[in-house]
Each structure stands twice: as C-alpha cells, then as structure tokens.
Regions:
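Conserved alpha/beta enzyme-core scaffold
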Residues: 1-520
C-alpha cells in the first residue's frame, strides 16, 4: 500500500504491526487517545533504602523472564556502559526473546551483537543503530523487527501503550539510596536524563544504576524517587569523554565551513530572523559551524535568541553566556562544555524528551521553533531525507530529533555535501525515507542551495541574495555528472526494520541486504 511519500508498505507489515501507512505529518493532529499506565507496587512503609548489591539481584527482584521489554538511554553516547552491563547479566541468566527499547544504540554496543545470533535479543526499538548491531539487522540476523523511531515518536509509543516497558534501566551519574537521580555531580556526568523520563514514568519496574551514591536527598533531581524501585552501585556507568565522538564535533573542513556560511546567509534573510527567534542545530560539523557564524550576525544586528533547544553544544552555551541567547532548554548534551553548562548555568534548563518532541502531548517545544539546522545522508528531488540507512543499505544512523524538529520548525534547513565520498547525497530517490519532504524547506550543499517550491515566501526572500540558488533537480544532476547515477542498493524481500513516522504510522521499511550482483 502506497503512503504519502510514495513508499509501498507491504500489507503483511501493516497487518502484523497494526499500523497505518504514513498519510502526512499532520494527519493525526487533534486525535484523542488515552495514555498508558505503569504497574505500581506502593511503598508505604519501608526500611528507607532501595539499594541492591548487584544488577543480577535487581533482575531477580524485577522477576525478569523471557519475552520482556527492557529500556535504556544513550546520554553517554559512545561512552555508555550500562546497556552492555545489564545485557551480559540477562544473558548469564539464560533469558531469551528480549526486546531492547533504547533511545539510541551505537558502536559501543558491538560487544552484545552475539546476543542477536543466540536469540537473547529478538527485537530492537531505537532511534537508530550504528555499528555491528546495525549490520546484523540489515543482514537479517535479528529474529524479529527493528523499529526505528524519532525521539518524540519513542515517547509517543511508550505513553500510548504501543510499547510497554517491563524494566527500565537508568544510568544515573548521581543517585541516593532512595532513587533520586541527577545527571550531574558525579564522576560520569552527562548533563541531563531527558530520554529516561518517559521510561521512569511508564515502566513497570525502574532500576537506577550509578557509580556515585550521594547522601539523601539528592537534590535537585531529574528523576524522582517516586518512580524508582531499586538502586544498584557499580564501578563505572559511562565515559563522558566519549560523548563528543563521531558527528558531535566541530569542523575545520573548508567544504563544511562554506555550507555553514551559506546557511547563515539564508537564515539572516528570512522573515523569522528577528529579535526573539528560536533555534536548534544538529551535531554535524557544518551545523555546529553555522551556529558560530550566525553569532556574528546576531551581534551586528543586536538580535537575541529567545531559546535554543534540543541537543546542546559548546557554541550554543557560549551564546547563552554572552547574552545572545536568553535560555537553553536541553534534552541532550553533546560535549563536556555543555554538560558543565547544564550543571552550573541557571538559564540552562533540563526538559524531558516528551516536552521536547512528543507529537501526542498538548504541545512540544519543537512546535515553537523558528529554525532547525539538520544534516542528512541523502536528500532526494522530493526533499525527502534519509538519516538511518547508508548508501550500502546497512542501518548505520539514527532518526534522533530529525523528523520532530523538521515537522515543528517554521524553517527547516538541511545541510549536506553534494557527495559523501563518491556517493551522491542529492539523488532521485533516497534509499529510505526518514523525514518527509513536506517538512524540509531548504537544502544547502557545497554546490548550491535548493528551496522547496512550496515555500514561495522563502524564494522571494532569497531571490536577490546573490547566493547560488538552484533547483533540487539541478543539484542532483551536478552530483550525477561527477559520479554517474549510482546503482540502486539490492535488497531481498524480507522486511527487517520499520521506519516509523513520529505519529506511529509507517514511513518506510528496511529490507534485508543481499550481495551485489552485476547486471548482465
């Protein structure tokens, strides 16, 4: 069955999942539903401590069994140690058929890939997956399905009851013996615990894992004791030095700096760039560089940002410190500078993942965005974006807040080089659609800028800018002239993953890859 972005979704997947095809970003606006609830065992009179000696003890107390759903956050990014630690204990107990519901997974989780092969892990729900686990999914080694959701879509799935968490594990930089948790004040700080908030609220059991036990009460807390069942102290929950890895680094690449300068020129010419504008940037090098160059224009024009939101980086914190931004509302910190800012700056505020991007609450922060600056692996001539599946067909990225912010912002700008290596980034059709073209307004490459034709207002604002404006088809043709039109990735018939739209409908499917075969 064809959906609103032209992807054919197999009827079998619609039947098995009970989902509808994607019918547009705002198709479910105003739809009423009833939130799910956790199973709660009241603690009316206790001994005053929830401490347990080990993760194994916590698993046994939570009555771990085959077929359960376990959840984790990824605030430590590639420095996370909690997910692997817990799953090793699950494996030792001989538990099978586990669904992992993680806010994201990466190469730090490579050591548990064997648990996919032996049936310990049979389903994965995540923003995305990188590394060996992504490869295992694409090769069809996961017995069940991998469901990739945006950050907002994950909250929606949990609170609607579509995903019910049996046990949530929250790696907490500090905790007291009664379960008040904070992301700061310990030896492995991560700034915020935003992705754990829905898990704490809706999971049947919640286990805090910390390497820094502090006196009661741990105040201020980001996760309250009223949601936590048990606390376990371990040697090490994460390595903060590995938070700023991969995408989350500034750049000195001249091509990326050129695209950042184009981005600044676009932003400053739109009607939204005025005192009190709101802004989010991604963590790609060009996106971070665009924040730095935009600050010069803000100083020149005496324009101040009302709030910056989302994943926070050092340049955003520096805008706050300088007074160019009034407030930061934070769901994830991408470097140690941002972590320190979250702990010390009174105008740097923690918000939950639901407050940030949940499409099924009564209004998330993304709805109030003027600008969002994003990256993409691929953009097609329909302005659809792919941020999850690589050009080789392997799951190697994450939706993150990409679809959420694109849907909410008044001006969504996607920055991507015309080529990624020798692979065109602008193409006729993306390998997999993760963000629909209806939500993308401007595409910036190192060879020119394309404006979505439906945004005549932006075309008018930029027509005399002197910028290298081109149609999206022209950008594709430039890319193809350099490399030739690439061969399409060859997939098998089996669907191994689902790309969910943020509202829970099916945007696209991911099929099992098969060895490349040359045409006769």
């Amino acid at each position: 069955m064809k959906n609103a972005v032209g992807r054919d979704i197999p009827e079998e997947n619609l039947r098995v999942t009970g989902k509808d095809v994607f019918r547009g970003s705002h198709a479910m606006d105003g739809k009423e539903y009833r939130r799910d609830g956790a199973r709660v065992k009241p603690v009316i009179n206790s001994e005053g401590s929830k401490l347990l000696p080990s993760i194994k003890d916590a698993l046994l107390k939570c009555e771990i069994k085959d077929g359960m759903t376990l959840s984790f956050h990824h605030h430590f990014r590639e420095g996370d140690k909690v997910l692997n630690m817990v799953m090793e204990e699950v494996h030792k107990l001989g538990i099978k058929n586990i669904t992992i519901c993680a806010s994201s997974m990466g190469s730090q989780n490579n050591p548990i890939v064997y648990m996919i092969d032996d049936g310990t892990i049979t389903n994965i729900q995540s923003s995305g997956v990188r590394g060996e686990i992504g490869k295992a999914i694409s090769e069809g080694r996961l017995q069940g399905l991998a469901i990739m959701r945006s950050h907002g879509g994950r909250v929606r799935a949990i609170e609607s009851g579509e995903t019910h968490i049996d046990i949530a594990f929250i790696g907490a930089p500090t905790a007291d013996e009664y379960g008040n948790l904070n992301a700061n004040g310990g030896k492995a700080n991560c700034g915020v615990l935003s992705y754990s908030a829905p898990d704490a609220l809706y999971a049947d059991k919640v286990v805090a894992i910390t390497d820094c036990l502090v006196p009661y009460p741990n105040w201020p807390h980001q996760i309250s004791q009223i949601y936590v069942d048990y606390v376990v102290v371990v040697d090490e929950i994460g390595d903060p030095s590995k938070i700023a890895t991969g995408a989350a680094k500034p750049t000195s690449d001249q091509r990326k700096l050129l695209m950042a300068s184009y981005c600044t020129e676009v932003v400053k010419r739109t009607p939204y760039f005025k005192d009190g504008f709101s802004y989010q940037t991604g963590v790609g090098g060009a996106s971070i560089a665009s924040t730095i160059s935009l600050a010069d224009v803000m100083r020149e024009r005496n324009i101040h940002m009302s709030f910056g939101v989302g994943g926070i980086t050092k340049p955003m914190c520096q805008l706050l410190e300088e007074g160019l931004a009034r407030t930061l509302v934070d769901t994830q910190d991408f470097d140690e500078y941002a972590i320190q800012s979250a702990a010390t700056n009174p105008n740097h505020h923690y918000i939950t993942a639901g407050e940030y991007a949940d499409p099924f609450n009564k209004g998330a922060y993304v709805n109030k965005l003027d600008f969002v600056i994003l990256a993409a692996l691929e953009v097609d001539v329909h302005f659809n974006c792919n941020v999850v599946v690589g050009s080789n067909g392997v799951v190697s990225g994450a939706q993150g807040g990409h679809p959420d912010t694109a849907a909410g912002a008044k001006c969504t700008i996607v920055i991507t080089p015309i080529l990624q290596g020798r692979i065109p980034s602008v193409c006729t059709d993306v390998t997999t659609v993760t963000t629909p073209g209806e939500d993308v307004d401007v595409v910036i490459t190192d060879y020119g800028i394309a404006i979505n034709p439906k945004r005549q207002d932006l075309m008018d604002a930029l027509k005399d800018s002197g910028l290298p404006l081109k149609s999206i088809e022209e950008l594709r043709d430039i890319a193809y002239a350099m490399t030739g039109e690439p061969e399409r990735v060859q997939f098998g018939d089996r669907v191994v993953g689902i790309i969910e739209a943020r509202n829970g409908s099916i945007m696209d499917v991911v099929r099992e890859i098969k060895p490349f075969q040359f045409a006769d």
